[in-house]
């Protein structure tokens, strides 16, 4: 009986310790490196962005556009005013 009580207290203590030790930490998925930040450019480049012969063009990533959230209707719900 004592062994069961001691193991349950130990498990609770370890659980609390693991929770509070990781609470303030943040794990970024893609940490940004200061020298590796790329600007975004439009998907269809204009004539001013076209590279000329012998000139290097700045490497950029395509811009991401935020899509509007699609509205969904709950069947049988009354319209809200």
From Swiss-Prot:
Highly cationic protein that has multiple functions. Acts as a chemotactic factor that mediates lymphocytes recruitment to epithelia through binding and activation of the G-protein coupled receptor GPR15. May be a tumor suppressor; together with SUSD2 has a growth inhibitory effect on colon cancer cells which includes G1 cell cycle arrest. May regulate keratinocyte proliferation. In addition, through activation of Mas-related G protein-coupled receptors (MRGPRs) contributes to pruritogenesis by activating itch-selective sensory neurons and mast cells degranulation. GO terms for molecular function: chemokine activity; G protein-coupled receptor binding; receptor ligand activity. Interacts with SUSD2; the interaction is direct. It is found in: Secreted. Its main location: secreted. It comes from the Eukaryota. The keyword Signal applies. Keywords: Antibiotic, Antimicrobial, Chemotaxis, Cytokine, Disulfide bond, Secreted, Signal. This is Protein GPR15LG. One of its GO terms (cellular component) is extracellular space. The gene is GPR15LG. Disulfide bonds join 40-63, 41-60. Residues 1-24 form the signal peptide. Pfam families: GPR15L (PF15854). GO terms for biological process: angiogenesis; defense response to fungus; defense response to Gram-positive bacterium; G protein-coupled receptor signaling pathway; lymphocyte chemotaxis; mast cell degranulation; negative regulation of cell cycle G1/S phase transition; negative regulation of cell division. InterPro entries: GPR15L (IPR031713). It comes from Sus scrofa (Pig). The keyword Coiled coil does not apply.
């Amino acid at each position: 009986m004592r062994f069961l009580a001691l193991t349950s207290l130990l498990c609770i203590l370890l659980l609390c310790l693991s929770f509070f030790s990781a609470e303030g930490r943040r794990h970024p998925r893609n940490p940004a490196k200061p020298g590796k930040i790329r600007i975004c450019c439009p998907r269809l480049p204009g004539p001013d962005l076209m590279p000329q012969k012998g000139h290097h063009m700045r490497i950029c990533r395509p811009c991401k556009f935020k899509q509007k959230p699609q509205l969904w209707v709950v069947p049988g719900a009354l319209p809200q005013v």
